[in-house]
């Protein structure tokens, strides 16, 4: 079995596939076989008895890449990938939240808003965000899509509403120290507006028991940070964590 799993791999790829313990970073360009190495490694770990299927976590960024990884492992592993955790970061976060929903303050069947649904949700609460610049009278919904995208990016970067507000306040203080800098003053006003809207958006989602795409990642991080026993449970479960395109 090992010979088949290592077939067609170069020396460096074989070393990566058969690496037994400790962290390992692979730096390689597109199309160089990184996903192949990860899928072969999953199969090799199982064939060597170094891990059970539910002790391996493989993460990637896109649904397409996750499905591709699942298909390849399904071919390599006789009994399939059923119990192997192969998913995107957001899908992994979603699974953590559902498995620990009550602790996270969520209904286990919570709804995940799509981007269009998040925009509709924002529009329904438009006058609760205290917007001025980002709610122009001529076109009140003009910036909704941009704000939703910004909030999502902030959560993907693990920036909390509190941290964003701190940044906006620092910018405001700097602008007050440079009263002649009108562009800085305008930016500070805008960022303060965004910061308050971001915090309000998160509060409204929580109040209605909803989760958006960014919250799948962000809230799962919060869950692990705030609940050491839950973190420990997953640390003990996963003997090997493989990340595609970290």
What are the roles of these predicted feature ranges?
Residues 1-108, 112-113, 119, 232:
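P-loop NTPase Walker
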Residues 53-54, 134, 213:
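A local structural micro-motif
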Residues 7-18, 22-26, 37, 57-58, ...:
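Conserved helicase NTPase motor core
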Residues 116-210, 228:
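Basic/charged alpha-beta structural segments of nucleotide/phosphate-handling enzymes
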Residues 20, 73, 99-100, 125-129, ...:
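Alpha-helix boundary/capping residues
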Residues 24, 46, 77, 104, ...:
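Short amphipathic alpha-helical interaction patches enriched in hydrophobic/aromatic residues
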């Amino acid at each position: 079995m090992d010979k088949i799993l290592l077939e067609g791999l170069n020396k460096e790829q074989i070393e990566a596939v058969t690496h037994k313990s400790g962290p390992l970073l692979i730096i390689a360009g597109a199309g160089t076989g990184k996903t192949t190495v990860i899928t072969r490694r999953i199969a090799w770990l199982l064939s060597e008895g170094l891990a059970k299927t539910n002790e391996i976590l493989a993460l990637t960024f896109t649904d397409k890449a996750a499905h591709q990884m699942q298909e390849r492992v399904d071919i390599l592993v006789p009994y399939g990938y059923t119990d192997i955790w192969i998913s995107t970061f957001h899908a992994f976060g979603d699974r953590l939240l559902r498995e620990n929903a009550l602790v996270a303050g969520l209904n286990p069947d919570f709804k995940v808003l799509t981007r269009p649904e998040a925009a509709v949700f924002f529009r329904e609460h438009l006058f609760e965000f205290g917007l001025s610049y980002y709610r122009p009278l001529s076109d009140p919904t003009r910036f909704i899509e941009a704000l939703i995208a910004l909030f999502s990016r902030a959560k993907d970067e693990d920036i909390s509403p509190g941290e964003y507000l701190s940044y906006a306040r620092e910018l405001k203080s700097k602008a007050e120290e440079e009263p002649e800098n009108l562009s800085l003053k305008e930016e500070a006003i805008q960022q303060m507006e965004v910061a308050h809207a971001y915090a309000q958006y998160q509060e409204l989602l929580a109040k209605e028991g909803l989760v958006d795409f960014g919250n799948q990642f962000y809230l799962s991080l919060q869950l692990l940070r705030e609940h050491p026993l839950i973190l420990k449970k997953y640390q003990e479960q996963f003997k090997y964590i493989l990340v595609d395109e970290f």
